[in-house]
A protein has these predicted regions:
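Mixed-charge, polar/low-complexity N-terminal
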Residues: 12-15, 19-21, 33, 86, ...
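A conserved beta-strand-loop-helix scaffold within acyl/acetyltransferase catalytic domains
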Residues: 19-61
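Acyl-donor binding region in acyl/amide transferases
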Residues: 52-115
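Short glycine-aromatic motifs
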Residues: 2, 28, 110-112
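Glycine-rich loops and low-complexity Gly/Arg-rich segments
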Residues: 28-30, 58, 67-69, 119-123
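Short amphipathic alpha-helix that is part of the acyltransferase structural core
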Residues: 1-25, 130-135
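Terminal substrate-recognition subdomain of acyl/acetyltransferases
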Residues: 32-46, 95-135
């Protein structure tokens, strides 16, 4: 079963960041994704006056060493869950400012590169207007 839950302690967040090979951001909020109780990924993000900023949607290294698996769905659900939280907080724009963006994943989540090449999404109605195309 897929679970996406907020990370409650900074020590846990730092440890997962180390496992994912990403920079730990102590001022960021974070979600962790697990499949069948196995940790698969982390998303670090922050709420700012400009919008929500996602810094990482990263896979924990070495969790699929002896088996074939894909983390795309777990990372997708975690990314969408993060955007939903940002939207529920009254912040209706989000940006991805990570080091190495996965274009396919970010586009599936709903981000699009803006004129400056920064992945961005307008969350106005994104989770409530199911009949409209969002870009």
């Amino acid at each position: 079963m897929l679970k996406v839950l907020p990370i409650q302690s900074k020590e846990t967040q730092e440890s997962i960041c180390r496992s994912a090979g990403i920079e730990y951001r102590p001022d960021a909020l974070a979600y962790a994704a697990s499949v069948d109780e196995e940790l698969v990924g982390i998303c670090q993000f922050k709420l700012t006056s400009e919008g929500g900023i996602l810094y990482d949607i990263a896979t924990v290294k070495d969790h699929c060493v002896n088996k074939e698996c894909s983390d795309f769905e777990a990372l997708f659900v975690m990314g969408r869950g993060t955007l939903n939280f940002i939207d529920l907080c009254g912040v209706h724009r989000a940006f991805y400012q990570g080091e190495s963006p996965d274009d396919r994943l970010l586009r599936a989540i709903g981000f699009r590169p803006n004129e400056k090449g920064i992945y961005e999404i307008n969350l106005e109605g994104f989770f409530t207007d199911h009949c409209h195309e969002h870009s």
